[in-house]
Amino acid sequence: MSKISLIVGLGNPGAEYAQTRHNAGFWFVEQLADRYNITLKKDPKFHGFSGRGQIEGHDVRLLIPTTFMNRSGQSVVPFSKFYQISPEAILIAHDELDMDPGVIRLKTGGGHGGHNGLRDIVPHIGANFHRLRIGIGHPGSKDRVSGHVLGKAPQNEQTLMEDAIHHALSNTRLLVDGQIAQAMNQINAYKPK
C-alpha cells in the first residue's frame, strides 16, 4: 500500500494555454491546492510551481511543471528524485483523448498511451506511477488532435470536465491514505450527469 505523496498536474504554461483541454491536469492540481490551502510557488530549480502541505493528515507535495507538455520530464523527474519519491507514490493528472469529457479514470502503471507529457516521463522513472486520466474527447481525426487539445472546450464540455474533477477531488483522502483500489472503484464509477 503506497500512499500518494506527490501529485503532478500536466499542461502547458502561459495564459494562452490556461483554459485549453491539454491543461486538465493543471486544473486538478490547482483546485486541490485551493481546497487544502496549499500555496504553489515558482520553483525554478524544478521548472515548475510547487507546494507542500497537509492533505487529509498526510504530508503531500504538489507540482505543476512550467515546461511545455512534451518536456514534462524535465520537471517531474528531478523533483521526484530530489525528494526521493518513488513512482508508486506519484499521481500524475493529465488530459485523455480516448475518453469523453466528463469521464475520469484512475489507473496504475501502463505505457504513455501516446500522451506526450507521459512519453517524456516514463523513460526516466518507469511506468509504475498512478495516473488520473481526465477525458477531453477525441476530435475524430488524427489531423485535428493538436488543434483539439490546444483549443478551449465549449461550455457544456468544460462543465462535464469540471464535474469529473470535482468528483476525483472528493476522493482525495483515499489516494493519500494509500487506498488506491478503493479510490479506483470510487473514481472510475463516476458517471457524467
From Swiss-Prot:
Outline what the protein does.
Answer: Hydrolyzes ribosome-free peptidyl-tRNAs (with 1 or more amino acids incorporated), which drop off the ribosome during protein synthesis, or as a result of ribosome stalling.
Catalyses:
an N-acyl-L-alpha-aminoacyl-tRNA + H2O = an N-acyl-L-amino acid + a tRNA + H(+)
**Which residues are listed for tRNA binding in this entry?**
17, 68, 70, 116
Q: What class of enzyme is it?
A: hydrolase
Write one Gene Ontology MF term: peptidyl-tRNA hydrolase activity
Q: What is this protein called?
A: Peptidyl-tRNA hydrolase
Matches recorded under InterPro entries: Pept_tRNA_hydro (IPR001328), Pept_tRNA_hydro_CS (IPR018171), Pept_tRNA_hydro_sf (IPR036416)
Phosphoprotein as a keyword of this entry, yes or no, is: no
Q: Does the keyword Repressor apply?
A: no
Which Gene Ontology cellular-component terms appear in the entry?
cytoplasm
Q: Domain of life here? A: Bacteria
**Site features described as Stabilizes the basic form of H active site to accept a proton, chain residue numbers:** 95
Enzyme Commission number(s) of this protein: 3.1.1.29
Entry similarity comment: Belongs to the PTH family.
Q: Which CDD domains match?
A: PTH
